[in-house]
Every structure is written in C-alpha cells, then in structure tokens.
Swiss-Prot record:
Pfam family of the protein (one): Ribosomal_L23
Its job: One of the early assembly proteins it binds 23S rRNA. One of the proteins that surrounds the polypeptide exit tunnel on the outside of the ribosome. Forms the main docking site for trigger factor binding to the ribosome.
Family in the record: Belongs to the universal ribosomal protein uL23 family.
Domain of life: Bacteria
Source species of the chain: Bartonella tribocorum (strain CIP 105476 / IBS 506)
GO biological process: translation
Protein name as it appears in the record: Large ribosomal subunit protein uL23
Gene from which the chain derives: rplW
Keyword rRNA-binding belongs to the record: yes
Length: 97
C-alpha cells in the first residue's frame, strides 16, 4: 500500500471531549473512509504515525435527516475508528501529519 492510500484511509482525527477522555486508555479516534476495513486502518495508522496498533474498533454514525427551506435532505454517514495503541505508544493528534 502506498502512502497516498494511507492518507485516503485516514480522513481526520476526532477531537471531542469524549475522544480526549479515551486517550487515558491509550486510544485515539479518527474519521476514516466509509469503505475502509479494520486491517487497512491499522496499516495506515502504523505507517503514518510509526506506532504499534493493538486493536481497531469501528463505528458508523448514520447521517441525520435535515430540512432546509422545506426541502428534506440527508447528511452523509460518517465512519469513525477507535484505535487502541500498544502500551507505551502515543500519538499527538494536535500536530499535523
């Protein structure tokens, strides 16, 4: 897999109150491509951040139905990955890649 493919898998880090709380458990949250698989996410995180990944859990948040000027629309689904790192490994998501 090339580096460009890794950048296509990982879209952005998730920086919320909940995602900062899970950092205590050596976990990091990322928005990922909707068709990305767990092995692809693991390979991308290990290649881009030079860390060892212990586990990957994924969540698909369904898009909400929204109304704008009487027209009903739907937001896109978002896939989020919670990556558990091996002990002693850290990722600083506040700095860019």
């Amino acid at each position: 897999m090339t580096d460009l493919r890794h950048y296509d898998v990982i879209i952005s880090p998730v920086i919320t109150e909940k995602s900062t709380m899970i950092s205590e458990y050596n976990q990091v949250a990322f928005n990922v491509a909707p068709k990305a698989t767990k092995p692809e996410i693991k390979a991308a995180v290990e290649a881009l951040f030079s860390v060892k990944v212990k586990a990957v859990n994924t969540i698909v948040r369904k898009g909400k139905v929204k109304r704008f000027k009487g027209i009903v629309g739907r937001q896109s689904d978002v896939k989020k990955a919670i990556v558990t790192l091996a002990s002693g490994q850290t990722i600083d998501v506040s700095t860019g890649l």
